[in-house]
UniProtKB/Swiss-Prot annotation:
EC number in record: 3.6.1.73
Protein name: Inosine/xanthosine triphosphatase
Alphabetized NCBIfam families for the sequence: inosine/xanthosine triphosphatase (TIGR00258), PRK05074.1 (NF003459)
Protein's UniProt keywords contain Nucleotide-binding: yes
GO MF entries: ITPase activity; metal ion binding; nucleotide binding; ribonucleoside triphosphate phosphatase activity
Pfam families referenced in this protein's UniProt entry, alphabetically: NTPase_I-T
Catalytic activity reported: XTP + H2O = XDP + phosphate + H(+); ITP + H2O = IDP + phosphate + H(+)
Gene Ontology biological-process entries: nucleotide metabolic process; thiamine metabolic process
Family: Belongs to the YjjX NTPase family.
Residue positions binding Mg(2+): E38
Alphabetic keyword roster: Hydrolase, Magnesium, Manganese, Metal-binding, Nucleotide metabolism, Nucleotide-binding
Amino acid sequence: MHHVVSATTNPAKIQAILQAFDEIFGEGSCHIESVAVESGVPEQPFGSEETRAGARNRVANARLARPNADFWVAIEAGIDDDSTFSWVVIESASQRGEARSATLPLPDVILEQVRAGEALGPVMSQYTGIDQIGRKEGAIGVFTGGRLTRSSVYHQAVVLALSPFHNAIYR
């Protein structure tokens, strides 16, 4: 059984990680352990590079916290121009996989508050009345009318980031 360390305690992110690992390696083949670690970037990262750095930093910190795992996984959400997205970083002892998620354009009324220094999650909670929305369906769920959720979009990016770990051509 693979020991997978999730560099987050966010249920939406953990669900995406578990589902993707089950699909790639077989249901029940992985044990997910969650750890809360720092990203080393602002709570609301801006731009692709800052967001990717946050995910890479979380993986590095998870490796320090749980050095005996088989995989370390981080999902860092950010704002790029007028959209929200995330970076997924997965490492094993010898490999790294990275993938960027789909992007969701955000309305100006939300972007104004985020650009003024507030994190997207609290702004969305204020807008929708849904407490801790970032740990649930997220802005993605709200603005797609539930057709997609934060977890479903993250799931796709985790599957993509896992590609080097189960395809021999990457080695």
